[in-house]
UniProtKB/Swiss-Prot annotation:
Alphabetical list of PROSITE patterns matching this protein: TGF_BETA_1, TGF_BETA_2
Originating species: Homo sapiens
Domain of life: Eukaryota
Residues annotated with Phosphoserine modification: 325
Gene coding for it: GDF9
Classification via InterPro entries: Cystine-knot_cytokine, Growth_differentiation_fac-9_C, TGF-b_C, TGF-beta-rel, TGFb_CS
Protein name: Growth/differentiation factor 9
Outcome reported for the amino acid change (mutating residue 428 to T): In POF14; uncertain significance
Positions of region (Disordered): 303-330
Length: 454
């Protein structure tokens, strides 16, 4: 029995020694497979490289734009929106944001999100009548699943586009009748709400008038607030020319065609990653900042004076000279004093902590098929060495100086202060959603505007 036991022991040892070798060969083969697949998918979006990051760490590592916009990205192709609706949202983007994507400071509205939905289905109920001025009535179904629970509706409008170019010398009075149809499976609570609304509006068309907006906030606000995401409505128009002002009009008749409307929702995104308009005062009131902040090293993303950097660098150089001259007036130390080392510790480092540009195009990431605007993005980043005596020039707290002393005098394992962003500006983004809707959103903390040492 001794020999079989001894043989079994040797066999187990041999298998244990061989196991790492086979495992290593399998691992190397797996790495080769991954490398080959990476070459085949070299055109894939950079987000795919980050899928293995733990969900708890992802929030701290990824900027809000890449984190939020990549949610819900699937393999199915995106539906393309109506060209007229896309043109309208591009004009809206130019009104709200600069070419670089920064929200304009003269804004007065409270919403930070605008969503445009086109109807999923369109059914004509009855033909129009040119004699009576009745336009063809239609039934529309809007799918609002893209609205999240943190988005609160502030305003909603139906946007009509006039199909053919019309020019009227007189005012055109239109009466719109709109009725919401509730599905059979709806709850009783929603059934009690009024679902039939009649809008009496007077529209005046000019030579270049192409759009009609009908405010339906009072109708949709309770529905969206109750998480109703499927809106089925019936709409018809009756339009006539003003006979009193222009009696020569031929019985008030005209030929006008309205394309099926889009639904625009103006929302306030209350999440932390969204830009909130009341914070815009923080960017407007630069003169009211404290003296310490005014002396800090800063850079502004767009539209600021180019001479600001020159003046700040001049002041930094002058303050550095004053510091060195004041230190030279002090009595000299021991004979072993090294003058060059003494100068070096007070002069600013050559690679000073400051802002750097990093301009990228969304076409480089192959995201330009769904990010409509801006075309380019400059997040900027902070890089450089932090001086030993940071003082208040960077807006750094006293703790930064204490950390420097600990690093130099007590424990070198304690890291030195790092060059990091201190302030940011928001970014406006216009995107095409997977369902073909169009979204304008404003994201907080997307562009670094100031560096500090911490």
């Amino acid at each position: 029995m001794a020999r079989p036991n001894k043989f079994l022991l040797w066999f187990c040892c041999f298998a244990w020694l061989c196991f790492p070798i086979s495992l290593g060969s399998q691992a190397s083969g797996g790495e080769a497979q991954i490398a080959a697949s990476a070459e085949l998918e070299s055109g894939a979006m950079p987000w795919s490289l980050l899928q293995h990051i733990d969900e708890r760490d992802r929030a701290g590592l990824l900027p809000a734009l890449f984190k939020v916009l990549s949610v819900g990205r699937g393999g199915s192709p995106r539906l393309q929106p109506d060209s007229r609706a896309l043109h309208y949202m591009k004009k809206l983007y130019k009104t709200y944001a600069t070419k670089e994507g920064i929200p304009k400071s003269n804004r007065s509205h409270l919403y930070n999100t605008v969503r445009l939905f086109t109807p999923c289905t369109r059914h004509k109920q009855a033909p129009g009548d040119q004699v009576t001025g009745i336009l063809p009535s239609v039934e529309l179904l809007f799918n609002l699943d893209r609205i999240t629970t943190v988005e609160h509706l502030l305003k909603s409008v139906l946007l009509y586009n006039i199909n053919n170019s019309v020019s009227f010398s007189s005012a055109v009075k239109c009466v719109c009748n709109l009725m919401i149809k509730e599905p059979k499976s709806s709850s009783r609570t929603l059934g009690r709400a009024p679902y039939s609304f009649t809008f009496n509006s007077q529209f005046e068309f000019g030579k270049k008038h192409k759009w009609i907006q009908i405010d339906v906030t009072s109708l949709l606000q309770p529905l969206v607030a109750s998480n109703k995401r499927s809106i089925h409505m019936s709409i018809n128009f009756t339009c006539m020319k003003d006979q009193l002002e222009h009696p020569s009009a031929q019985n008030g008749l005209f030929n006008m065609t309205l394309v099926s409307p889009s639904l625009i929702l103006y929302l306030n995104d209350t999440s932390a990653q969204a830009y909130h308009s009341w914070y815009s005062l923080h960017y407007k009131r630069r003169p009211s900042q404290g003296p310490d902040q005014e002396r800090s090293l800063s850079a502004y993303p767009v539209g600021e004076e180019a001479a600001e950097d020159g003046r700040s660098s001049h002041h930094r150089h002058r303050r550095g000279q004053e510091t060195v001259s004041s230190e030279l007036k002090k009595p000299l130390g021991p004979a072993s004093f090294n003058l060059s080392e003494y100068f070096r510790q007070f002069l600013l480092p050559q690679n000073e902590c400051e802002l750097h540009d990093f301009r990228l195009s969304f076409s480089q990431l192959k995201w330009d098929n769904w990010i409509v605007a801006p075309h380019r993005y400059n997040p900027r980043y902070c890089k450089g060495d932090c001086p030993r005596a940071v003082g208040h020039r960077y807006g750094s707290p006293v703790h930064t100086m204490v950390q420097n002393i600990i690093y130099e005098k007590l424990d070198s394992s304690v890291p030195r202060p790092s060059c990091v962003p201190a302030k940011y500006s928001p970014l406006s983004v216009l995107t095409i959603e997977p369902d073909g809707s169009i979204a304008y959103k404003e994201y907080e903390d997307m562009i670094a505007t100031k560096c500090t040492c911490r």
